[in-house]
């Protein structure tokens, strides 16, 4: 039994690491075009310009991922929607399944491990490129972390995130009565 549990845990970590690696690959490719991508939707009206077709044309879909209806499905089961909005390149990352209950979106599952790894191994090293890394929540307070260009004494800065900060932020999405989304804005 211990061997099976160990194997299962190792496979989960392998999938998570492959997912983080995939986001890094995608981001490295998109950063080469960041100035153009940001201006695809220059209005500050919140309108989104979806980049699924652009990602496919640039051959940036990470190995093992699939692109369906403009959304990226990862090796770990998370789903990312990438778009330009308000002069920013934005990733909306769903870390689990969800459903609607009386027109309210509720997470059925939320991978705190993947959330923690993305914040620690993806967002934190990109502190100088990111403007924001945050967790959108439908029912409670949003937690923002700011990139270097917006970092100040009054803000929570990505570069200063501790493992405890990351765990607390990601663990806040374990409840079953709301929907959480990890958001990265470049």
What is each stretch, according to the model?
Residues 7-10, 23-41:
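N-terminal alpha-helical signal peptides/signal-anchor transmembrane segments
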Residues 13, 29, 33, 121-129:
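Structured segments of extracytoplasmic/periplasmic soluble domains
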Residues 63-186:
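Intrinsically disordered, low-complexity regions enriched in Pro/Ser/Thr/Gly and acidic residues
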Residues 41-67, 72:
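Extended amphipathic alpha-helical segments with heptad-repeat/coiled-coil character used for oligomerization
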Residues 32-44, 50-53, 130-131, 138-149:
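Extended interaction regions within the primary functional domain
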């Amino acid at each position: 039994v211990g061997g099976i549990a160990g194997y299962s845990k190792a496979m989960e970590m392998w999938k998570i690491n492959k997912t983080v690696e995939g986001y890094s690959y995608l981001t490295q490719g998109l950063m080469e075009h960041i100035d153009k991508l940001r201006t695809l939707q220059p209005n500050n009206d919140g309108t989104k310009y979806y980049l699924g077709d652009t990602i496919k044309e640039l051959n940036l879909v990470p190995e093992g991922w699939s692109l369906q209806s403009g959304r990226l499905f990862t090796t770990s089961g998370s789903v990312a929607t990438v778009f330009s909005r308000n002069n920013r390149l934005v990733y909306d990352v769903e870390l689990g399944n969800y459903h609607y209950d009386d027109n309210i979106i509720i997470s059925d599952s939320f991978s705190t491990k993947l959330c923690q790894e993305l914040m620690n191994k993806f967002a934190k090293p990109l502190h100088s490129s990111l403007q924001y890394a945050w967790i959108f929540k439908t029912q409670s307070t949003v937690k923002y972390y700011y990139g270097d260009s917006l970092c100040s004494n009054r803000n929570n800065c990505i570069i200063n995130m501790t493992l405890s900060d990351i765990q607390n932020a990601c663990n806040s999405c374990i409840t079953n009565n709301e929907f959480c989304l990890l958001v990265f804005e470049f």
